[in-house]
Amino acid sequence: MSRASGYEILQKGVDNMITGQIIQTSIDELKAITKVDLGVYDLNGSEVASTMERDDITTDLITGFAASPADSQVIGVHHLLKIRDEGELLYVLVARGMTDDVYM
């Protein structure tokens, strides 16, 4: 592995860590305002940030929704939304709850 590629890998890890911290801070603030539990997952179903226990949020739930043509979907108490940046799907947002507040 060349030095440049090692640096690039390290930089990507640092960027992902910073992005995860920013996302966590954002959803913590949103939860404080909305009182709704939120989770952000990457397209492989790995948790990026969350205000709730993962419990019944499976990898298959996240990856299946990410692969579907739907932009949002309600499955039980989970409200799933796709997060895009300039048209590229990056994350899946999960809001948990049965009240009207979840339909932010």
Region spans (language model):
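Alpha-helical/coil-rich non-catalytic "connector" segments in signaling and regulatory proteins
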Residues: M1-M104
